[in-house]
Amino acid sequence: MSSVPDLSIRQFDFDENPETASTLPAATYFDRDWFELEKRRIFRRNWRCVGHVNDIADKGDYVTDAIVDQPVFALRCRDGSIRAFHNVCKHRAHLLLTAPRGTLKSKLITCPYHAWAYDNDGCLQAAPHCESIRGFDKSEIRLDALKVEIILGFIFVNADLDAADLLPQVAPGVDRLVRHLPDLETYRLASSITFDIAANWKNVGDNLLECYHCQPAHKAFVDLVDMDSYSVEVDGLWSWQGGICRPENTAYNLPAGLSELEREFATFYIWPDVAFVLFPGSRAIASFVFGATAAESTHQVFSVYTPDGELDDVTRDICRYFNDVLGPEDVALVENVQKGLHSMSYSRGRFFVDPERSYYSEHAVHHLHGLVFDHLRDFFHGA
């Protein structure tokens, strides 16, 4: 691919000042050639959250995922370490592991197609009848590994083995999360819900990262969170936003007697496609992964982790609120935006920003757009 065909993309110049900037061109939200560039330049070079260490607590446990169209898996190895590989057999490209999660039936990772088997280092150990194949050397064949990093118990993988470590780039946000929940490494999955959304991943991210839409679109949410206390912070590869919640509201009721810290709702976003959400009144944390699957489709997974893997009454009510109210409200919003992005009457919009970083400030959306621009800078201006 030598160029991006849409003229509005080629002529775009990103303004680093959010007060005067315009959003990314509409075509970047549906142009298929542009999405191919994003797959290579963004998703195959950045960190993807694939779960928590306690999702694969025992030796031989695994989880599978996909970095857009690249199947991957993370495995708890026999030495207790966690490793990750491309989930593709080196023989004929069959997926090695086909379930979302499970446990290996033996010490080896065995392809269900022709029974090629690999050890926990990804080295080929068995290939039936290979002794009859001229010049075949098992020792030369191994699965392609991914880089792995564990942050607060959550497993991040990267297809770029030379990628910079993630933690130093998001440490201030991680430190803030630890002040709320210092023992996240011990948490266990309690609930998960998925939404397959007919919208581009950036569209889903834009909606997640601003609360300008909250008053008209999320009546219960603005009854829960005091919008006067809401603020937005951006830095590097992360952003943080949220506010203080009211104990009595129409979303869900908080326990009495909580401190201000315990009543803070917060969204901690890590580039490019994951956020961690704190719901006050609960010791739970939610991971919010909005993984791109195509130019105009996103697979959104909202997973709730708790200290014991169980839902107490408050956390169960939070799940009910997100699953039945807040989540569907946002899905409808972004799907309608996706339709509007195709209109010949729209090319790009303006950011609504407040120097005080209040609830209606779209600083975090501007931050997301800036990161997209940085990763594909040379493809703008007709490059």
Q: Which residue ranges define each predicted feature?
A:
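C-terminal catalytic domain of Rieske-type non-heme iron oxygenases
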Residues: 81, 87, 149, 154-383
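Short Pro/Gly-enriched beta-strand edge/turn motifs at strand-loop
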Residues: 45-57, 127-131, 268-272
